[in-house]
Amino acid sequence: MDAGFFRGTSAEQDNRFSNKQKKLLKQLKFAECLEKKVDMSKVNLEVIKPWITKRVTEILGFEDDVVIEFIFNQLEVKNPDSKMMQINLTGFLNGKNAREFMGELWPLLLSAQENIAGIPSAFLELKKEEIKQRQIEQEKLASMKKQDEDKDKRDKEEKESSREKRERSRSPRRRKSRSPSPRRRSSPVRRERKRSHSRSPRHRTKSRSPSPAPEKKEKTPELPEPSVKVKEPSVQEATSTSDILKVPKPEPIPEPKEPSPEKNSKKEKEKEKTRPRSRSRSKSRSRTRSRSPSHTRPRRRHRSRSRSYSPRRRPSPRRRPSPRRRTPPRRMPPPPRHRRSRSPVRRRRRSSASLSGSSSSSSSSRSRSPPKKPPKRTSSPPRKTRRLSPSASPPRRRHRPSPPATPPPKTRHSPTPQQSNRTRKSRVSVSPGRTSGKVTKHKGTEKRESPSPAPKPRKVELSESEEDKGGKMAAADSVQQRRQYRRQNQQSSSDSGSSSSSEDERPKRSHVKNGEVGRRRRHSPSRSASPSPRKRQKETSPRGRRRRSPSPPPTRRRRSPSPAPPPRRRRTPTPPPRRRTPSPPPRRRSPSPRRYSPPIQRRYSPSPPPKRRTASPPPPPKRRASPSPPPKRRVSHSPPPKQRSSPVTKRRSPSLSSKHRKGSSPSRSTREARSPQPNKRHSPSPRPRAPQTSSSPPPVRRGASSSPQRRQSPSPSTRPIRRVSRTPEPKKIKKAASPSPQSVRRVSSSRSVSGSPEPAAKKPPAPPSPVQSQSPSTNWSPAVPVKKAKSPTPSPSPPRNSDQEGGGKKKKKKKDKKHKKDKKHKKHKKHKKEKAVAAAAAAAVTPAAIAAATTTLAQEEPVAAPEPKKETESEAEDNLDDLEKHLREKALRSMRKAQVSPQS
């Protein structure tokens, strides 16, 4: 009975034991859908799991892996109990959330088991929507991308078109401002003065009396190019073929034409560009013309540089310098206009924009185009002439006005150049010879580009483009534009002789870099130009005087570095070099060689001829006598370097920079005049080295035998300098960009091939230059080492490129250079034989290459050159030889072969 109470009662019947789940099932509220059973075998659980995870995370506020996995485990059973699941989840989610969760989950499972794929239709719809949205988004993105691309393309196209428009609009402006204003006015005015003043027979300017000049200025914006082309062909032909005989005859015919077209074009363009300048310059130049009859003579010469160039040269050194200066401006400004107007702007843009690469291309195109187009030849020789004449004519104008001591004309160069020109003119009124300075001005034009802006911009002149841009901001703009024209012309001739002309500009710009030393150099060139013009006019005594005056003129050079150096260039540019060298016609054939030699020689010839006259007055007369014999004229160019070298000694400190550049450039010109032209082209690296050595070798040349060498080395260096003018921007760029150096080195790689041996040989001459280069070398020495490193290093790669790019060009140039070398060697040797044929020849070739290298180095490292030149003159010989050998070995083994032939 004790346990009777518990008998027969089961746990279910016992109130103490209840089934709590049953109670919960009775108590809890469940969604209706939970009544249906789900076959999980038909459901794709992997699709449901992401939803469960998401939902549980939403309910709990955080991701609870335990709960999620618990739910998954419950669903893994074939037929899960929905109510029991809800009861089990109530502890985790609480009753309400669990009910809601199960109410959402079960319909998904039901729809999933009904679906063939086991995926809930809601998910399918969601995914479809997502897919559609994705597609829409992708389409939008694609359309956006397309739109962006279209916009980019449009922007690019717009930019390109705007750039093209800007370039187009800029190029005419540059052309107008650059070539016309300085050259037209100065050349027409000077032509008028020439005609009115000194040579009535050669008075091409008879019709070009001051009155016709202004009229022509206005009249011949249209005529200048065609008439210039026509005249220039005749003039250039006269220059090359009939230096003396044709000169007087073509002069009268082209003079009337040229006065009107060239004057008109020059004057009008100048008016357009520098109407303020042109007015003051034309006035001052007219004054200058009236003031200096010798200038009037030179003008005729300038005009008929090719025609009466040699005769004029012969008639009187004074006439020679001034006519060259004036006549080349007449001729050359119009053709440069053409080139400037055509491609000069583009080329200048190229040169300024991509001076390194495009200067080489533009120069190559120019050198190619001049030979291709006889008219262009005339224009390219005109370019030469223009380099001589345009650059010469503006410089000449400047110089002529400056000889008359009319600062306004020099204003053409630039406001600063005007001041320096004024000082120059007052000082250079000494340098009516700077009409020969006009030739120098051709170089001067290049120099002007660097010099006239260089005087002040020379420091700014770190780049020719800088010169162009800020050269001498106000007047420099037109002057710079002119310079750009000249640069382009020079670069065009730089192609042929562009690297030389560019190098001329570069040395001058390196002068600018050298600052005062550069100015001095330019001034010393200008001095040598003006002294040498004087010397030319006065011949021997004036030479001596001008040499002497150069040292005083260093200030002039500094002040009128741009004008004064331009005269040098112009002198050298003075077609006498061309005319001297019937080989200049070969140069025209190999436009680059010819231009190199003629332009460079011209440029340097002006100052070198002064040097020669100074150094050996009789040789200049001989060269004058030999003006008809182009070889002697070439020599005259190289002798002008001699004269320079003699003036260089006095100018050394001031002139050294310019003279080292110019002395070295004259040595290069002479080099080119002899056979160094190839060397110049071949020895870009030699040139850099040579610039150091050349500064010393040119001084050596400036000595008795070194003066002939300098002539050779200076005039070759003039050509290399022209290249530098092309690549000085590049070289300045060269340091930045070696494309143009490549072009230069194409030329200079050719040069280095034949020229590097010469630089090695020239290195011996280097020691003499140390003394001369000491004063400038102080400024130079810093730059020269850099240039050595840069130019040797760049020159291998650029020469390699130039070997590849300019391989064909180099071969042609080498052949042309070899021919020219032979011709120049013969001619220079004739002149040198007087002083030292064997020493001059051997030293001239190697010094010429060294001068070329020195020109390159001096151009950018004029400041650094002097001390290095002193130390490196002895070391430069070894270092330059080693560097040249290494560079040539590395970059130009083929150039070594060429070097062996040039050296031999």
From Swiss-Prot:
The gene is SRRM1. There is a cross-link at K231 (Glycyl lysine isopeptide (Lys-Gly) (interchain with G-Cter in SUMO1)). The modification N-acetylmethionine is found at M1. The modification Phosphothreonine is found at T220, T241, T406, T416, T555, T572, T574, T581, T614, T718, T778, T793, T872. Residues 139-904 are annotated as: Disordered. Residues 1-151 are annotated as: Necessary for DNA and RNA-binding. Residues 428-438 have a biased composition (Polar residues). GO terms for biological process: mRNA splicing, via spliceosome; regulation of mRNA splicing, via spliceosome; RNA splicing; RNA splicing, via transesterification reactions. The modification N6-acetyllysine is found at K140. Changing K22A: Strongly reduces DNA and RNA-binding. Belongs to the splicing factor SR family. Identified in the spliceosome C complex. Found in a pre-mRNA splicing complex with SFRS4, SFRS5, SNRP70, SNRPA1, SRRM1 and SRRM2. Found in a pre-mRNA exonic splicing enhancer (ESE) complex with SNRP70, SNRPA1, SRRM1 and TRA2B/SFRS10. Component of the minor spliceosome, which splices U12-type introns. Found in a mRNA splicing-dependent exon junction complex (EJC) with DEK, PRPF8, NCBP1, RBM8A, RNPS1, SRRM1 and ALYREF/THOC4. Interacts with DDX39B, CPSF1, RBM8A, RNPS1, and ALYREF/THOC4. Seems to be a compound of RNA export complexes that are released from speckles in a ATP-dependent manner. InterPro entries: PWI_dom (IPR002483), PWI_dom_sf (IPR036483), Ser/Arg_repetitive_matrix (IPR052225). The modification Citrulline is found at R7. Residues 300-688 are annotated as: Necessary for speckles and matrix localization. Keywords: Acetylation, Citrullination, DNA-binding, Isopeptide bond, mRNA processing, mRNA splicing, Nucleus, Phosphoprotein, RNA-binding, Spliceosome, Ubl conjugation. This is Serine/arginine repetitive matrix protein 1. GO terms for molecular function: DNA binding; RNA binding. Pfam families: PWI. PANTHER family: SERINE/ARGININE REGULATED NUCLEAR MATRIX PROTEIN, SERINE_ARGININE REPETITIVE MATRIX PROTEIN 1. Residues 27-126 form the PWI domain. The modification Phosphotyrosine is found at Y596. Residues 1-156 are annotated as: Necessary for mRNA 3'-end cleavage and cytoplasmic accumulation. One of its GO terms (cellular component) is cytosol. Its main location: nucleus. Residues 352-368, 478-501, 593-605, 701-719, 736-759, 771-786, 837-866 have a biased composition (Low complexity).
